[in-house]
């Protein structure tokens, strides 16, 4: 698995590896100096998805995401890679090659180069929080809200290719939005959706029986971090998010 360090990504990983134990976890930091890692902790009393309902209290979500971490069973190799170094670290690539990987599961912030993808027997799949091809790149859950189009919030599971979020689509899913949700509720629901559909996509790729839909790359846009400003972030308060969902559902 290749993951980032934001709590939602780590939350997905924590639950995923409790059932599907990977050979190794490559965790990218939030910054180029290796800062921003969610630290590995003891596996005792690990937090789990705490509710299957829609009306999840904000404080419960805060507890889940503020205290969640990646389990690291003793036989799972764990690498930490500073942001921007994934495709440049020759020692890391050597170790990946030696692990004889079947498939790469990606849920991280950095594009994975073809050299690493080719090291896995069946290539890789990416968990993209956004509905490709309309919303590719970064912050693609926030942009639909800023565009007042919450109907475009969802998850895309696609095969990895050399570009950013452009690979053939295996699965897409949308959350059942509720009018009393904050952005954190949306994030939580996407984590659960990902956990439900990634194993299906993984098994299909491994069995060679996957049905894919090629993306029409003439549609939509690829968004980059520099476009998402502090002004954008300040706009997405609970009242704004709830209002966008209410307008969509009415």
Regions found by a protein language model. Give the residues of each.
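One-carbon transfer enzymes
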Residues: 1-250
């Amino acid at each position: 698995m290749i993951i980032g360090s934001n709590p939602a990504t780590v939350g997905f990983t924590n639950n995923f590896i409790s059932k599907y134990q990977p050979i190794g976890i490559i965790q990218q930091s939030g910054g180029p100096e290796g800062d921003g890692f969610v630290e590995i902790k003891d596996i005792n009393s690990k937090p789990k998805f705490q509710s299957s309902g829609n009306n999840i209290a904000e404080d419960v979500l805060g507890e889940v995401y503020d205290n969640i971490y990646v389990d690291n069973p003793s036989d799972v190799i764990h690498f930490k890679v500073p942001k921007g170094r994934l495709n440049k670290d020759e020692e890391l690539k050597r170790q990946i090659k030696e692990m004889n990987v079947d498939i790469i599961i990606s849920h991280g912030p950095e594009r994975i180069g073809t050299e690493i993808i080719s090291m896995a027997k069946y290539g890789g799949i990416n968990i993209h929080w956004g509905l490709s091809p309309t919303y590719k790149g970064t912050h693609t859950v926030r942009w639909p809200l800023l565009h007042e189009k919450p109907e475009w919030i969802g998850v895309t599971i696609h095969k990895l290719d050399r570009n950013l979020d452009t690979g053939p689509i295996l699965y897409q899913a949308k959350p059942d939005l509720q009018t009393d949700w904050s952005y954190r509720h949306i994030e939580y629901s996407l984590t659960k959706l990902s956990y439900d559909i990634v194993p299906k996509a993984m098994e299909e790729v491994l069995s060679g029986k996957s049905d894919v839909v090629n993306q029409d790359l003439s549609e939509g846009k690829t968004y980059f971090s520099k476009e998402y400003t502090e002004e954008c972030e300040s706009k997405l308060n609970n009242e704004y998010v709830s209002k966008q969902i209410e307008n969509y559902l009415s």
